Amino acid sequence: MGNLFGRKKQSRVTEQDKAILQLKQQRDKLRQYQKRIAQQLERERALARQLLRDGRKERAKLLLKKKRYQEQLLDRTENQISSLEAMVQSIEFTQIEMKVMEGLQFGNECLNKMHQVMSIEEVERILDETQEAVEYQRQIDELLAGSFTQEDEDAILEELSAITQEQIELPEVPSEPLPEKIPEDVPVKARPRQAELVAAS
């Protein structure tokens, strides 16, 4: 019981699975960063409007420069996300290709084993024997067909028709035994005696 429950199951998580998970986590973090930067850009744009209304043009200009730099960061972040997603797709497709290759390898191994069991020579021998059997049967059919004349064929058909007619005309044989018949001219007292003689015989 201890061995049964104490044995650890072998992990099916591969290095490729770990890499895909890590790449997706980085992608999600970049998207969160994008969202945060986008919200900040909206606030700074509103603040720049307020500064211009207040006549603080230089301050508004400086704020817009910062905003422009953050927009460039946002574009670079989008490119990084695209690269991460492309990498994830490449790894996943490579995993599919590996599965296909494993299937092809297994199929080739099965074919090789089957070829070892039945070689080309064995297949050719079986085909030759089959062809010989077919040819032998064809020769027999030709001999049988050539050994009868038209008169023989007519006689065979006539006999077949006669047998068929006999089967039609013959009465059916009763399946139950016939009842014992006692002659009417025998006296009544003598009838039991006659029945005993019949039974004794």
UniProtKB/Swiss-Prot annotation:
A lipid is attached at G2 (N-myristoyl glycine). It is a lipid-anchor. Residues 178-188 have a biased composition (Basic and acidic residues). Residues 171-201 are annotated as: Disordered. PANTHER family: CHARGED MULTIVESICULAR BODY PROTEIN (PTHR22761), CHARGED MULTIVESICULAR BODY PROTEIN 6 (PTHR22761:SF5). The modification Phosphoserine is found at S119. It is found in: Endomembrane system; Endosome membrane; Late endosome membrane; Membrane. Signal peptide: none annotated. GO terms for cellular component: amphisome membrane; ESCRT III complex; kinetochore; kinetochore microtubule; lysosomal membrane; midbody; multivesicular body membrane; nuclear pore. GO terms for molecular function: protein-containing complex binding. The keyword Metal-binding does not apply. GO terms for biological process: autophagosome maturation; late endosome to lysosome transport; late endosome to vacuole transport via multivesicular body sorting pathway; midbody abscission; mitotic metaphase chromosome alignment; nuclear membrane reassembly; plasma membrane repair; protein transport. ISGylated in a CHMP5-dependent manner. Isgylation weakens its interaction with VPS4A. Pfam families: Snf7. Residues 10-145 form a coiled coil. Keywords: Coiled coil, Endosome, Lipoprotein, Membrane, Myristate, Phosphoprotein, Protein transport, Transport, Ubl conjugation. Belongs to the SNF7 family. The acidic C-terminus and the basic N-termminus are thought to render the protein in a closed, soluble and inactive conformation through an autoinhibitory intramolecular interaction. The open and active conformation, which enables membrane binding and oligomerization, is achieved by interaction with other cellular binding partners, probably including other ESCRT components. Probable core component of the endosomal sorting required for transport complex III (ESCRT-III) which is involved in multivesicular bodies (MVBs) formation and sorting of endosomal cargo proteins into MVBs. MVBs contain intraluminal vesicles (ILVs) that are generated by invagination and scission from the limiting membrane of the endosome and mostly are delivered to lysosomes enabling degradation of membrane proteins, such as stimulated growth factor receptors, lysosomal enzymes and lipids. The MVB pathway appears to require the sequential function of ESCRT-O, -I,-II and -III complexes. It comes from the Eukaryota. The gene is CHMP6. A motif (Type-2 MIT-interacting motif) lies at residues 168-179. Probable core component of the endosomal sorting required for transport complex III (ESCRT-III). ESCRT-III components are thought to multimerize to form a flat lattice on the perimeter membrane of the endosome. Several assembly forms of ESCRT-III may exist that interact and act sequentially. Interacts with VPS4A; the interaction is direct. Interacts with VPS4B; the interaction is direct. Interacts with CHMP4A, CHMP4B and CHMP4C. Interacts with SNF8, VPS25 and VPS36. This is Charged multivesicular body protein 6.
